[in-house]
Swiss-Prot record:
Self-association and partners: NDH-1 is composed of 14 different subunits. Subunits NuoA, H, J, K, L, M, N constitute the membrane sector of the complex.
Keywords, in A-Z order: Cell membrane, Membrane, NAD, Quinone, Translocase, Transmembrane, Transmembrane helix, Ubiquinone
Gene Ontology biological process: aerobic respiration
Taxonomic placement: Bacteria, Bacillati, Actinomycetota, Actinomycetes, Acidothermales
Name this protein carries in UniProt: NADH-quinone oxidoreductase subunit H
Compartment annotation: Cell membrane
Annotated TM spans: 30-50, 98-118, 138-158, 176-196, 213-233, 262-282, 302-322, 336-356, 368-388
Any Pfam family the entry gives: NADHdh
Entry membrane topology: Multi-pass membrane protein
Enzyme Commission number: 7.1.1.-
HAMAP family recorded: NDH1_NuoH
GO cellular component, as recorded: plasma membrane
């Protein structure tokens, strides 16, 4: 497929590789079977991921993990689900009952819908009918996944607002800010893939990776997406909406029984979905890795499903690995990283990749390459200048506490300094005249008190 614009010379920039075969029109019972198959896969993947996460993190912490229910503890997640179903369903007195009950459903439903456009494999024969191993495909399938992941945050925000408690509200507000920040970086990381494949369809993107995976020609986009998908799913080290040490349990503090289980289910399904999307966009999708791709039957029949699941499992393991090894980010660090690092780097990479695509199909090498290099240098220089400015502020001691913020040495509740501020030891004497006589902020004992 080639996108043409009235014979414009830039039209071949978006020329794609040979696309996948046309989607077969499925009969009604085949659609039902595929729908139930996707639903069952997501539920089983969630149960397995919970078990795997508990076992792997336990090994990292020199523990054993669940090993009582079923062989190797494989049925422990199912037992926990039954336990949650039998627990008392409590609705707080101050909660908005209708919204409180609806919020988990709003969070879980888009998580299931987003997986509908992920291709598991090529065209296969089921009971004599040829069908793609994909529930459905859309011309804008990747944007559909992005939209569904955005809708899920509405359930989290409504859960925090309707609980009638300050901690869930803080968790909901954090989640909204987090999604707004990292959804932009995630969406921009898709642009590099679109430039190369020439399509927004997941099947066409997999077909465009027949000879070279997306990670090779969009490595920067892959790195940005890998970081953004962790922030998008509220997973460690970006699990700020449910930070136990700060806001108890975050947005689901007041939830119990099946409503809590729905939030848990939505979180893990979102993990599976963003991991499957990474596999589809950057890791060749269901196509066999080298050297297995040299086998003529590697990308035919049901074998591609195995390659897809192996890649998916590797990406999901990274989620577990991050949770067991990295501490939680501070909120200001997290937001600053998204807006000042990921988005500028992604925008610069899009310009560079677009310039490279233009160079490949035209004779504009004279000015396109220097222009791309100039943009890259400007982006790097801006980032370095920002780092130097921050370090110089820290080296100088940062801003001095004003009179209204000077702690009272006699108070049993001292005010902790904010990031970048320095104690006023040795400075109070020089600033004694700035304080009103007899005020609470007036320094005691000749200015020897600690700030």
């Amino acid at each position: 497929m080639t996108v043409t614009t009235l014979g414009h010379p830039l039209a071949p920039v978006f020329a794609a590789a040979p696309l996948s075969p046309p989607t077969h029109r499925d009969i009604w019972w085949l659609i039902i079977v595929k729908t139930l198959g996707v639903f069952a896969f997501l539920v089983l993947a969630t149960l397995f991921m919970i078990w795997a996460e508990r076992r792997v993190v336990a090994r990292m912490q020199q523990r054993i993990g669940p090993n009582r229910v079923g062989p190797f503890g494989l049925l422990q997640s199912l037992a926990d689900g039954l336990k949650l179903a039998l627990k008392e369903d409590i609705v707080p007195t101050l909660a908005d009952k209708a919204v409180f009950i609806l919020a988990p459903v709003i969070s879980a439903t888009p998580a299931f819908l987003a997986f509908a456009v992920i291709p598991f494999g090529p065209t296969v024969s089921i009971a004599g009918h040829h069908t793609n191993l994909q529930l459905t495909d859309l011309p804008v399938a990747v944007l559909f996944v992005l939209a569904m992941s955005s809708l899920g945050v509405y359930g989290i925000v409504l859960a925090g607002w309707s609980s009638g408690s300050p901690y869930p509200l803080l968790g909901g507000v954090r989640s909204a800010a987090q999604v707004v920040s990292y959804e932009i970086a995630m969406g921009l990381s898709f642009v590099g893939v679109f430039l190369y494949s020439g399509s927004l369809s997941t099947s066409d993107i997999v077909a465009a990776q027949a000879h070279r995976w997306g990670i090779l020609w969009a490595g920067v986009s892959f790195a940005v997406y890998a970081i953004a998908m962790v922030g998008e799913t509220n997973r460690a080290p970006f699990d700020l909406p449910e930070g136990e040490t700060e806001i108890v349990g975050g947005f689901h503090t007041e939830y119990t029984s099946l409503k809590f289980a729905l939030f848990y289910l939505a979180e893990y399904i979102n993990m599976v979905t963003v991991s499957a999307l990474m596999t589809t966009l950057f890791l060749g999708g269901w196509r066999a890795p080298w050297p297995l791709s040299l086998w003529s039957q590697a990308n035919v029949g049901w074998w591609p499903v195995l390659w897809f699941l192996i890649k998916l499992g590797i990406v999901l393991f990274v989620f577990i690995w991050l949770r067991g090894t990295l501490p939680r980010f501070r909120y200001d660090q997290f937001m600053q990283f998204g807006w000042k690092v990921l988005i500028p780097v992604n925008l610069t990479w899009i310009l560079v990749e677009a310039a490279i695509r233009v160079v490949n199909v035209s004779n504009w090498r004279v000015w396109v390459i220097p222009f791309a290099i100039f943009l890259a240098l400007v982006a790097v220089g801006t980032y370095v200048a920002d780092l130097v400015r921050q370090r110089s502020e820290v080296g100088d001691g940062g801003p001095i506490l004003g009179p209204a913020l000077v702690p009272n040495p006699d108070s049993p509740y001292p005010i902790p300094p904010l990031p970048g501020q320095r104690p006023l030891v040795g400075v109070l004497e020089a600033r004694t005249d700035d304080f009103p006589v007899g005020s609470a902020a007036e320094p005691r004992n000749g200015g020897d008190g600690d700030a």
